[in-house]
């Protein structure tokens, strides 16, 4: 199968790829410490918003382009990918901001009351109020969907995109793919329960109102008006969000600079050491590309 304008890469030997000149001693030292669990801690801050819950975030100031990390559903800013990314950016002197959506982590609000629109507003607030200049948005799972939405809304604040197991439209399309009688049962209950190994309860619960609201934010029905560089990383063993979604996103994005990187052993969270190295090297390559273009 051939995908025009796309580069499909099966990552095998991570250390051999992407600008070895950047692998300086400080960079490697920082990354090794991070993966070993030794980290410089950034301070949690809280952003107040009129009539909206406070957002918790951690920020390291530095050079442009900066990086903003968008976590997945029911996740937070303290995951392995976010921690590793902060250490990497700190070692290069680039700014990074990671945060919790409304109802997630240390932010105010209730998870069950959140919507795709709610969390899109959170990211827009971060871009408008908490960072300066164009950013590299790194979105994991539902964060990958949100990064697409905000890149469309704020092209001037988006330098590049890195999606990890991008879950564009996935909640909506998965529900619609259920047999009609099964959908009707959930609609009568007013709630869709999705089995998951990522929750203590063993399921995620989505209200019918959540699903209806999410339909307003679907992006795969036509061309996606994004023209910045885009990198989409996905694991072939992802049992939560099929890797084909990243291919669909890549096919629809208008940018000519789109790479899809598939990891043969990669699972949904992409939090193994080699997964994290691939993410970091991908961002390193983008930083080099963007700073060279200036």
Where do the language-model regions lie?
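N-terminal cap/lid segment of alpha/beta-hydrolase-fold proteins
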Residues: 31-61
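Short beta-strand element of the alpha/beta-hydrolase
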Residues: 64-72
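The serine-hydrolase catalytic nucleophile loop
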Residues: 74-86
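Conserved alpha/beta-hydrolase
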Residues: 86-106
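Catalytic nucleophile-loop/oxyanion-hole region of alpha/beta-hydrolase
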Residues: 104-130
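Alpha/beta-hydrolase fold nucleophile elbow
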Residues: 131-140
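The alpha/beta-hydrolase serine catalytic core
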Residues: 136, 145, 157-263, 267-294
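Glycine-rich nucleophile elbow surrounding the catalytic serine of serine-hydrolase chemistry
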Residues: 139-149
């Amino acid at each position: 199968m051939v995908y025009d304008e796309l580069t499909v890469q099966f990552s095998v030997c991570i250390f051999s790829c992407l600008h070895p000149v950047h692998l300086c001693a400080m960079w490697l030292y920082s990354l090794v410490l991070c993966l070993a669990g030794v980290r410089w801690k950034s301070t949690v801050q809280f952003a107040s918003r009129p009539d909206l819950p406070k957002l918790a975030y951690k920020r390291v100031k530095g050079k442009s382009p900066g990086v903003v990390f968008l976590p997945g559903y029911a996740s937070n800013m303290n995951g392995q990918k976010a921690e590793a990314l902060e250490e990497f950016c700190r070692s290069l002197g680039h700014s990074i901001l990671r945060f919790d959506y409304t109802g997630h982590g240390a932010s105010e609000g209730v998870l069950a009351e959140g919507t795709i629109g709610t969390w899109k507003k959170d990211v827009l607030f971060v871009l408008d109020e908490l960072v300066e200049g164009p950013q590299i948005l790194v979105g994991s799972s539902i964060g990958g969907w949100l990064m697409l939405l905000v890149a469309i809304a704020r092209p001037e604040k988006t330098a590049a995109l890195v999606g990890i197991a991008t879950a564009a439209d996935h909640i909506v399309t998965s529900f619609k793919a259920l047999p009609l009688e099964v959908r009707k049962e959930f609609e009568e209950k007013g709630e869709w329960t999705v089995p998951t190994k990522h929750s203590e309860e063993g399921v995620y619960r989505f209200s019918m109102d959540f699903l209806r609201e999410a339909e307003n934010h679907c992006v795969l029905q036509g061309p996606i008006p994004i023209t910045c560089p885009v990198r989409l990383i996905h694991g072939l063993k992802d049992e939560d969000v099929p890797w084909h979604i990243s291919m669909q996103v890549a096919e629809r994005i208008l940018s000519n600079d789109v790479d899809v990187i598939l990891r043969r052993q990669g699972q949904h969270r992409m939090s193994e050491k080699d997964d994290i190295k691939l993410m970091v090297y991908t961002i390193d390559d983008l930083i080099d590309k963007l700073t060279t273009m200036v």
